[in-house]
Amino acid sequence: MSKVIRCLTTDATVMAMAMDATDMVAEAERIHHPSAVVTAALGRLLTASSMMGILLKGRDDSVTLKLSGNGPAGTVMAVADSEGNARGYAANPVVEIPLKTNGKLDVSGAVGTQGMLYVMRDSGGAEPYVGCTPLVSGEIAEDITQYLSLIHI
């Protein structure tokens, strides 16, 4: 079970959230059998979608994150509900690329550094909200940070 910690200042002007998504990523790895670098990419997107899902107001609301980059993993997508339950997939789950020179997984090499991050929020009503930003780095966290810095929450 993934663990989430949410903190709110007493005047409700600042909110922080942290998540241990180890179990969720392990389950995705068990289901999809991706390579290590795609597991990292999918895990990052699952975690982000789950955290964004928890912030949704309606019980039937959902958020979809779709990363369409120019890397060999192809499209990586994750969908989460308002309880933080998430599921996802990578178009090409097995990508074998060398580690970075620092010994870390090359997530940006797998997903690509050029492309788009799409965020779709469905509140079950009229048209879903769809926003998008160009990829900044392909490291996923930086791309989502860029998106969040550009929208007005």
Feature map (PLM): residue ranges:
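Alpha-helical scaffold segments in soluble metabolic enzymes
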Residues: A48-M51, D143-Y147
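Conserved small/polar residues in nucleotide/adenosyl-binding loops
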Residues: I151-I153
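Gly-rich Lys/Arg/Thr-decorated short loops/hinges at beta-loop-alpha junctions or inter-strand turns
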Residues: G125
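Long, charged interaction segments in nuclear RNA/chromatin-associated proteins
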Residues: L135, E139-I140, T145
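N-terminal functional module of multi-domain proteins
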Residues: S2-M120, Y129
